[in-house]
């Protein structure tokens, strides 16, 4: 039917464990084995909700945030540590801005500043990076760029790069860490899948106890 738009899809992959909640959000099926393994590890000591969403891009992210918020209400998640994987990071970062009470901590894995940025957006971001902080260009793009709002992200945020991250994504994570007031950065790049997923889960569980009002900066570690 002409003009018909399919509602954005949010799928609960798993909901395991009990206690304090972790919510893992991703869109790329290539990460499915990793997030399943992380969810299983976290569920041994906390509640782990793994959610897959439709592809996040400059147009879809607004509807997906609304759909994710509705899903969290149905799941009775009132506060959680959120994990945004690749473009899924856009959704949890927006939640931290629009509904900060629900976000205890943020873990951002292999994410660029925008979801799936086009070549034009990459050029635009390079220009914006040279402007005074907080003055992004306004060229009609509806895409979410977390750099413009990083100074408002007050919850503790752990930035993680894995072996899957491209050099571009690694640079983007570093750039976010430089402007976000409460950010750490770690690398987990083991080729052993079990070591990698276990290390990620351990980081997430430990990071949940970070004081919410205790700004820190860029602790560099690697696994």
Mark where each language-model region is.
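Catalytic active-site module of serine/aspartate enzymes centered on a nucleophile-bearing elbow/loop
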Residues: 183-223
């Amino acid at each position: 039917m002409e003009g018909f738009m399919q509602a954005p899809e949010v799928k609960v992959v798993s909901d395991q464990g009990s206690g304090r909640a972790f919510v893992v959000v991703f869109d790329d099926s290539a990460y499915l084995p990793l997030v399943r393994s992380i969810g299983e590890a976290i569920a041994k000591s906390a509640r782990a909700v793994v959610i897959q969403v439709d592809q996040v891009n400059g147009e879809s992210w607004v509807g997906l945030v609304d759909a994710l918020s509705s899903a969290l209400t149905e799941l009775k998640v009132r506060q959680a540590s959120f994990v945004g994987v690749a473009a899924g990071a856009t959704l949890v970062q927006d939640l931290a801005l629009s509904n900060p009470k629900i976000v205890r901590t943020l873990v951002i894995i292999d994410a660029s500043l925008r979801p799936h940025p086009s070549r034009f957006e990459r050029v635009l971001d390079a220009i914006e990076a040279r402007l005074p902080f907080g003055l992004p260009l306004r060229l009609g793009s509806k895409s979410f760029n977390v750099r413009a709002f990083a100074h408002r992200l007050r919850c503790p945020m752990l930035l993680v790069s894995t072996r899957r991250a491209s050099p571009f994504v690694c640079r983007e994570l570093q750039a976010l860490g430089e402007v976000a007031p409460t950010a750490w950065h770690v690398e987990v790049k083991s080729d052993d899948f079990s070591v990698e997923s276990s290390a990620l889960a351990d980081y997430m569980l430990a990071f949940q106890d970070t004081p919410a009002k205790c700004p820190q900066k860029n602790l560099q570690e690697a696994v």
